[in-house]
Amino acid sequence: MGIGLYDYQIDAVNRMRNGCILNGGVGSGKSRTALAYYYLRNDGDPSSLCGDDYIPMGDPPKDLYIITTARKRDTKEWEADMVPFLLSTNPEINLYSNKIMIDSWNNITKYKDITDAFFIFDEDRVTGSGVWVKSFLKIAKSNEWIILSATP
């Protein structure tokens, strides 16, 4: 079974680029859309997004870091969204040999020296000039990244 995105999600994936902001309402499927973009950036097959059989990405895909709210990290919302992509933070369940980390904005400084990975920044917190912004700027220079936001 494939991933099965809605048409508007496929349209969004096709418009996305490194460094973009994906804006959508609460419950609009931004997380799954972001994972679909990651899937395609790592040699995933577009037909899998339309509901065709899942075709694995090249192995290993880039390490994936998801920086989100502490609540979303603790409730494992992202874990559920990763299931159709056969991704998991648990190496025994993850189909691939890449590293996947889901952490909160409070810990973003731990990742400022990561390079050649893919970051999804959920719930935009990169305005201003504080430590989160400084860490984000360092991460953005050495990695692929996208931002998800429910606020315009």
PLM feature spans:
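Structural recognition of the conserved hydrophobic beta-strand(s) that form the central parallel beta-sheet
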Residues: 66-67, 144-150
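Inter-Walker segment of RecA-like/P-loop motor cores
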Residues: 84-113
